[in-house]
């Protein structure tokens, strides 16, 4: 992300929460979950030198590899997948979501190991409406969930899904995998 909606000149992943850079806090959460986990970070090419400088300035020691981000999330993930060894289990997470808890990560990995994939979801508490040119009506929110990250997949499923051409309807990795014909858990 670039921080455009936040009207920040600094990309949001480089902002601080409680004196810690957001992306570093996010990475620390995953590193604490599993210190042997390979961490791949997709960043726009123009931000890589900033990241390297921040890591040096902050004495950030968590091992990770950088991959070049793409035009969209789809392209960023597709670029990163070239570094995935198969078979493995892959978690895709938004670097600006540092408050994910260990239990959510654990459940997602366990479910993906058992079923091939897992996405965390939460209930919607707000009212939901469908609005089109011909209708504007309330819909039962019990049928809808908010999708979060990390989204976790067995590597063969994710690698196969990303062989597809880009579709602007892809909003996350689950939508890419689902479009390839795989049921999402």
Predicted segments, located by residue:
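N-terminal glycine-rich phosphate-binding loop and ensuing alpha1 helix
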Residues: 1-49
């Amino acid at each position: 992300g670039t921080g455009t909606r936040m009207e920040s000149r600094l990309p949001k992943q480089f902002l601080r929460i409680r004196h810690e850079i957001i992306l570093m806090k996010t990475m620390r959460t995953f590193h604490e979950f599993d210190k042997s986990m390979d961490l791949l970070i997709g960043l726009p090419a123009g931000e890589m030198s900033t990241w390297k400088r921040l890591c040096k300035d902050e004495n950030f020691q968590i091992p990770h590899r950088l991959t070049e981000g793409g035009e969209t999330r789809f392209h960023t993930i597709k670029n990163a997948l070239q570094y995935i060894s198969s078979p493995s289990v892959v978690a895709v997470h938004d670097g600006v979501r540092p408050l994910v808890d260990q239990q959510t990560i654990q459940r997602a990995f366990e479910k993906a190991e058992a079923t091939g994939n897992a996405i965390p979801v939460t209930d919607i508490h707000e009212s939901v409406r469908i609005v089109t040119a011909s209708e504007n009506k309330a819909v039962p929110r019990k049928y809808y969930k908010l999708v979060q990250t990390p989204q976790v997949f067995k590597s063969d499923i994710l690698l196969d899904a990303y062989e597809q051409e880009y579709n602007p309807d892809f909003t996350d990795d689950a939508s890419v995998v689902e479009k390839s014909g795989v049921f999402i858990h």
